[in-house]
């Protein structure tokens, strides 16, 4: 996701993080701000663009070597790669964020990575190898020539919300939380975190990746890539996917909160 999506994931998470876990996370991040997760949600994207951080680029995705739209699947052993992927990163930073042998800066970095990667995993094209996760599928959206990946990350969410400031994200998150509390997500939200377990991070994160990857076949490119490269993706394609984008942002926030609550719970139990 882009800045708007990541901040919205973080604001949704802030709603569901327990007060005790919130204090713990604020302590790690050195922030008592009401945007303590949202304000650092895109740090990992900024970091990977620096010379010091370019090593981390592969951690933002897992390249599922499947065959959309005919066949979508994730295989951790097949797809992760020697330089690591989102799944291995979530496992690593889940361990590091509460490793007492590491420095407070290591803990803060680990939490910043977790906030970002758990969000990225719900963007279907971050769980797909085809055309570099859609980066090489050149399309037209709302009169602009861009690529399918950036439309999913940034331009379709911004079209829905109308901006990408923290205030826009906070407002979107409130709507998504309402949908979780008493709307069309209420019945399904418990399923978003079913079986999630910080002691089984590879299994859990692989399930998250598989959940989003399946949408590449059913929602992102159900008729293949070529079908998306004629005409403008707005409004017909946009209308067909925007509900899924909202759902995936909500999922990311709900899962992130549960993950932080679990990590904090395991800290207390030590």
From Swiss-Prot:
Identify the glycosylated residues: 92, 138, 184, 197
Reaction equations catalysed: Endonucleolytic cleavage to 5'-phosphomononucleotide and 5'-phosphooligonucleotide end-products
Q: Does the keyword Hydrolase apply?
A: yes
Region Substrate binding: which residues?
116-164
Q: What residues correspond to the site Important for catalytic activity?
A: 45, 48
UniProt binding sites for a divalent metal cation 3: 1, 6, 120
What cofactor is needed? Zn(2+)
> What does the entry list as the binding residues for a divalent metal cation 2?
15, 126, 149, 153
What disulfide bonds does the UniProt entry report for this chain? 72-217, 80-85
**UniProt subcellular location:** Secreted
- What does the entry comment about cofactor binding? Binds 3 divalent metal cations.
Q: What class of enzyme is it?
A: hydrolase
Swiss-Prot/TrEMBL keywords: Disulfide bond, Endonuclease, Glycoprotein, Hydrolase, Metal-binding, Nuclease, Secreted, Zinc
Q: From what superkingdom does this record's organism come?
A: Eukaryota
Gene Ontology annotations of biological process type: DNA catabolic process
**What is a single Pfam family found in this protein's UniProt entry?**
S1-P1_nuclease
Provide the residue positions that the database annotates as binding substrate.
1-6, 45-51, 60-63, 73-78
Q: What does this protein do?
A: Hydrolyzes only single-stranded DNA and RNA without apparent specificity for bases.
Q: What is this protein called?
A: Nuclease P1
The species is Penicillium citrinum
């Amino acid at each position: 996701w882009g800045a708007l999506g990541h901040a919205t994931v973080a604001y949704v998470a802030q709603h569901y993080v327990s007060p005790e876990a919130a204090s713990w996370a604020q302590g790690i991040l050195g922030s008592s701000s009401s945007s303590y997760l949202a304000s650092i949600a895109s740090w990992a994207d900024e970091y990977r663009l620096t010379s010091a951080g370019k090593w981390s680029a592969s951690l933002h995705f897992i390249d599922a070597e499947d065959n959309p739209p005919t066949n979508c699947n994730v295989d951790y052993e097949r797809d992760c790669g020697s330089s690591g992927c989102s799944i291995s990163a979530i496992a690593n930073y889940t361990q590091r964020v509460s490793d007492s042998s590491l420095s407070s800066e290591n803990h803060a970095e680990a939490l910043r990575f977790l906030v970002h990667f758990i969000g990225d995993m719900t963007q279907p094209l971050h769980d797909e190898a085809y055309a570099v996760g859609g980066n090489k599928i050149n399309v037209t959206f709302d009169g602009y020539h861009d690529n399918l990946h950036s439309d999913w990350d940034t331009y379709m969410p911004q079209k829905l919300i109308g901006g990408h400031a923290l205030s826009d994200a906070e407002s979107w998150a409130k709507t998504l939380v309402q949908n979780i509390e008493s709307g069309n997500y209420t019945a399904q939200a418990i399923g978003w975190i079913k079986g999630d377990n910080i002691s089984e991070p590879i299994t859990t994160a692989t399930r998250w990746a598989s959940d989003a990857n399946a949408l590449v076949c059913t929602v992102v490119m159900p008729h293949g890539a070529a079908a998306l490269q004629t005409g403008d993706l707005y409004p017909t394609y946009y209308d067909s996917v925007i509900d899924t984008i909202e759902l995936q942002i909500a999922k990311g926030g709900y899962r992130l909160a549960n993950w932080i609550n679990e990590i904090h719970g395991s800290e207390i139990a030590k």
